[in-house]
C-alpha cells in the first residue's frame, strides 16, 4: 500500500512536469528512425525493451533492461513502475521519435508516462495506450478525439489511444494513428514477452 502523502507528492510532481511539456508539430513524415518501448512483468521483475527501427527498411535493433519493480500498479501513476526501466532500455538507441506504451497528456494531470519520459529526456514522445484513462470521446470529422476539460488531448484509432507526450502535437498523433498500430511497438511487445520467458 502507498501512503496518501506520497501520492499527493507525486501528483504535485506530475503537475510540475505537465507545465514543462512542449506541444509543437514534429511531422511524422520527417521521422527516419522510430523507437518504441514496452515492458512485461514476472513477479516483481520488470523486463523492458527499447526498439529502434528504420522506417524505410524495417530493420531494427533493440536493448533490454531487467530490474526490480517495487511500486504497485495505481492508475495515473504508471510512471513510477515503468519509467525508470523504460529509460534504461532506450539509452543509446538511435531514433527521432519515441513511442511509449502508455498515455501522454491524455491523463488526469496531463502527465502520463510518455509525457514524463519525454520531459525528463527533452525528447519527442507519443503515448500509445490500449485503454482510456480519462476524458470524454467526441467524434468530429471522422476522427474520435479525447477531450479533457474542453481541450483535445488525444485521439482514438481502432482500439488504441494516441496522445502527445512531448515535442509533438495532436496532428502528429493523428498521422501516426492513421497508419495502424505501430510496428515498432508490436516488436517491443513481442521481445518483452520473449525475454521474460528466457
UniProtKB/Swiss-Prot annotation:
Entries under Gene3D superfamilies matching the protein: archaeoglobus fulgidus dsm 4304 superfamily (3.30.2170.10)
Organism taxonomic ancestry: Archaea, Thermoproteota, Thermoprotei, Sulfolobales, Sulfolobaceae
One GO term describing the cellular component: cytoplasm
An example molecular function term from Gene Ontology annotations: magnesium ion binding
Function: DNA repair enzyme involved in the repair of deaminated bases. Selectively cleaves double-stranded DNA at the second phosphodiester bond 3' to a deoxyinosine leaving behind the intact lesion on the nicked DNA.
Cofactors required: Mg(2+)
Gene label: nfi
Record's catalysed reaction(s): Endonucleolytic cleavage at apurinic or apyrimidinic sites to products with a 5'-phosphate
Binding positions (Mg(2+)): 38, 101
Site (Interaction with target DNA): 73
Protein location: Cytoplasm
Keyword presence, Protein biosynthesis: no
Location, primary (coarse class): cytoplasm
Keyword Heme set for record: no
EC number: 3.1.21.7
InterPro entries: Endonuclease-V
Keyword set, alphabetical order: Cytoplasm, DNA damage, DNA repair, Endonuclease, Hydrolase, Magnesium, Metal-binding, Nuclease
One GO BP: DNA repair
Protein name according to UniProt: Endonuclease V
Family note: Belongs to the endonuclease V family.
